[in-house]
Amino acid sequence: MYQSEFCDVSYNEELNIVFVKWKRFCRDKDYRNPLLYAIEVMKNCVGCHFCADTRDGFENEQADTQWVFDVFLPRALETSCKKIFFIIDADNALKEELEGLSAELSKRFEVHYCFGLDDVQKILAE
């Protein structure tokens, strides 16, 4: 388990997902360290998928978005992760921020937008 004032990262064994819960906006190491921890979880749990709850605290910061493409994405590809889930709010307030990430991520992963873990569970059960 990883915990900070910005983000909590945990492993959900039932769903076999690493769950990244953003609490408030952050950047640089405060943004990157939780994602590096998530990569380690995915490496250690075969078939583990990635799920980010973006309803609180997620914003697009150009340097961190580039870091996702340059560092997170290549490292995630070294794991057995096949699906990436973004939990969004009903009005999808972060649509623009997430579209940039999703366009690149969806080239290599199955990307889903969900309204909660129940939706994630349904997709994984298909």
Q: Which residues make up each language-model segment?
A:
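Amphipathic, Lys/Arg-enriched alpha-helical "gate/interface" segment within cytosolic domains
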Residues: 1-126
